[in-house]
Design a protein with these regions (language model features):
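Bacterial Sec-dependent N-terminal signal peptides
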Residues: 1-32
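Non-catalytic cap/lid and distal C-terminal segments of serine-dependent acyl enzymes
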Residues: 28-293
Length: 293
């Protein structure tokens, strides 16, 4: 009996030594790993919103605060690391490769969400929407945050140039459309994807806008992309593809020659899958590469 006990203890001791050595080996291997840094986390205290907001920042290769180079800025709604920040940043980096050279090196500002239903919607007259979106209707405050706090903050802290782009999908697309129609001068380029124009029974489509008038002289490029999305979650039946087309038709009626509108229908994508492909297409349409041959 004693013999078996001693033998078992020897086996156990041997196994423990093997596990310890394997653990030390794994620790040694992982200790040589270095973090892969894609961007930086910044914060801004907003008086307009009454809260602190997280910003995910991508700075292009070669960026230096002490340099005199200034970069276009892309403002990305739904810009958390677990939303659209990582893959959209990758698209801009890819399209900036020297053998592609479709977009210039750019600063990406991902605006992390707190309450997108609150921030991306204007007040609605539809009771069903009021009941379902109980915090909704504060987009004016969020637009004020972008205009009066965020853009000045980015301009002051980073080497931001004059060119500004906004990207928004779904309710983010609704907000981008509202800014386009109400405060178009905030951005030079608008990438609007699957906009939730059904909100408030499509009242945004009835809005008059300075960009439709001949005396609006700021050059604007607008991309509107939509997939095969079908019925919107609205009280009155609305089809999202139709609403997107109505927005395009509204903009193309403008007598303003400085407004350039690009419509993109992606029938192989739906509301959940469209963003990545649409942003890629938008960069191609808004920034055509001249023939190098």
């Amino acid at each position: 009996m004693l013999y078996y006990f001693i033998t078992s203890m020897k086996i156990l001791k041997t196994l423990l030594l093997i596990c310890l050595r394997l653990g030390l080996l794994a620790q040694s291997e992982t200790s040589t790993l270095k973090p892969f840094v894609l961007g930086y986390i910044d914060e801004i205290n907003s008086v307009q919103l009454g809260e602190k907001r997280i910003l995910n920042i991508y700075l292009p290769e070669g960026y230096s605060k002490t340099d005199t180079t200034h970069y276009p800025v892309v403002y990305l709604l739904d810009g958390s690391y677990d939303e659209d920040f990582i893959h959209v940043t990758g698209l801009y980096q890819f399209n900036n490769f020297s053998w592609i050279n479709r977009v210039p090196k750019s600063i990406i500002v991902g605006i992390a969400n707190v309450d997108r239903r609150r921030d991306f919607t204007y007040p609605t007259t539809i009771q069903k929407e009021k009941d379902s979106f109980t915090t909704a209707g504060k987009s004016a405050r969020f637009i004020g945050f972008i205009e009066k706090e965020l853009q000045p903050y980015i301009t002051k802290k980073y080497n931001a140039g004059g060119s500004k782009t906004i990207i928004g999908q779904s309710l983010g697309g609704l907000l981008a459309t509202e800014i386009l129609l109400k405060k178009p001068a905030l951005f030079n380029q608008y990438i609007i994807i699957s906009p939730s124009i059904w909100w408030d029974n499509g009242s945004l489509l009835e809005l008059d806008s300075d960009i439709l008038k001949p005396n609006f002289n700021q050059p604007l490029k607008v991309y509107i992309g939509v997939g095969k999305e079908g019925l919107a979650p609205s009280e009155t039946p609305r089809i999202m593809e139709v609403d997107a087309n109505l927005l395009v038709e509204k903009l193309k009626k403008a007598t303003n020659k400085n407004l350039h509108v690009y419509f993109d229908y992606l029938p192989q994508e739906d509301h959940a899958t469209i963003t990545h492909q649409a942003v890629f297409n938008a960069l191609r349409l808004l920034n055509p590469v001249t023939d190098k041959n």
